C-alpha cells in the first residue's frame, strides 16, 4: 500500500495516509476520506481537514457540512511508515489554518 505523508505549513510531519485512512505518526487511526476526494473526517465523522498540494493537511475555515459520512470498518494498525523528515515551509492557502488535533482525534 502506498503511504502519503502529510505535513503542516511549517513542514512538520503530522500524519500519513494509507489507502482511504489517515493515521498519526504513531500509527493511531485519526480519520478517513469517505468521499473519495481530499476531505478528511475524524473517527467521529467530523471534518478534520483537506489535503492540499499532495502532502499538506490544512483545515478549511467555514467548510460546508457534507452530512454524516457513516462509519467505516476499523482499519487496524498500519505499521510504522518510517520518519519522512522535514518538508519545508509552505504558506497557508487563504481561508485555511493548520489542523488542530484534539485528544479525541489522536
Give the location of each predicted region.
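Long terminal segments
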Residues: 1-4, 8-12, 44-106
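Core beta-strand residues in small-molecule sensory/regulatory alpha/beta domains
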Residues: 7, 23-24, 41-42
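N-terminal, post-signal-peptide region of Sec/Tat-exported proteins
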Residues: 32-35, 45
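Short, low-complexity intrinsically disordered segments
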Residues: 11, 30-33
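Fold-core signature of tandem repeat domains
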Residues: 30, 40-41
Amino acid at each position: 500500500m502506498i503511504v502519503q505523508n502529510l505535513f503542516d505549513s511549517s513542514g512538520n510531519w503530522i500524519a500519513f495516509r494509507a489507502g482511504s485512512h489517515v493515521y498519526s505518526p504513531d500509527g493511531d487511526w485519526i480519520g478517513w476520506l469517505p468521499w473519495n476526494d481530499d476531505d478528511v473526517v475524524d473517527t467521529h465523522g467530523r471534518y478534520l481537514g483537506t489535503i492540499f498540494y499532495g502532502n499538506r493537511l490544512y483545515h478549511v475555515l467555514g467548510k460546508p457540512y457534507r452530512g454524516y459520512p457513516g462509519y467505516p470498518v476499523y482499519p487496524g494498525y498500519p505499521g510504522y511508515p518510517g520518519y519522512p523528515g522535514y518538508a519545508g515551509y509552505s504558506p497557508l492557502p487563504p481561508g485555511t489554518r493548520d489542523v488542530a488535533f484534539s485528544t479525541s482525534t489522536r
